[in-house]
């Protein structure tokens, strides 16, 4: 790969006087602090949609009333993008992966709900409705649909495509959130859909 080496956070922390490309998922503030301290030149390829979301969450978090509200992120625990988002709140944001987990929120406190950019719009809307139904009228609930339309807008087309073919091979990395969402849409309309990520498969 033309001399490009992939590193993890542990290896990044030990680097000095190097040049590092950050991938699209975004990074928590600590990564940039480490880069300055260790004289690491950052080439920031963070997706602009993710960057805007990080800023939005940080602004919400630094407001004076943040003790009285919950910042909630609908996303996958441990996902690179989610780690970057939670990092904007010094680890205070609550991450929920599915509707079931929304039931454990404190509905006597205000809630600000955001979403990982690559999550399911349908599930996000169900979570919004659930919170609306259960939150106390004495507090406020604001939600921000921060799901990337590059993925969401493809869903109607991919459903149509999968329904019009007998067999679908969906080529994607097995860990890709975008890939999983789009493949699941194929599978819903055509059970004879298969996720593959290599020529061997």
At which residue positions do the language-model features occur?
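The feature marks the mature, well-folded catalytic cores of soluble enzymes
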Residues: 1-201
């Amino acid at each position: 790969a033309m001399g490009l080496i992939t590193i993890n956070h542990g290896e990044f922390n030990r680097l000095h006087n190097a040049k590092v490309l950050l991938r699209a998922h975004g990074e928590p503030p600590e990564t940039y602090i480490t880069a300055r301290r260790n004289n690491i030149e950052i080439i920031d390829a963070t997706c602009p949609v993710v960057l805007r979301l990080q800023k939005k969450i940080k602004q919400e978090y630094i407001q004076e009333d943040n003790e009285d509200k919950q910042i909630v992120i609908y996303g996958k625990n441990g996902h690179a993008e989610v780690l970057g988002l939670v990092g904007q709140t010094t680890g205070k944001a609550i991450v929920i992966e599915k509707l079931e987990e929304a039931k454990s929120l404190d509905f006597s406190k205000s809630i600000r709900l955001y979403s990982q950019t690559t999550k399911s719009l349908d599930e996000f809307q169900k979570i919004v409705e659930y919170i609306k139904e259960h939150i106390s009228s004495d507090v406020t609930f604001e939600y921000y649909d921060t799901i990337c339309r590059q993925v969401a807008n493809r869903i109607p087309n991919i459903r149509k495509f999968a329904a019009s073919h007998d067999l679908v091979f969906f080529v994607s990395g097995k860990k890709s959130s975008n890939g999983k969402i789009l493949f699941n849409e194929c599978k819903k309309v055509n059970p004879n859909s298969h996720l593959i990520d290599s020529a061997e498969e």
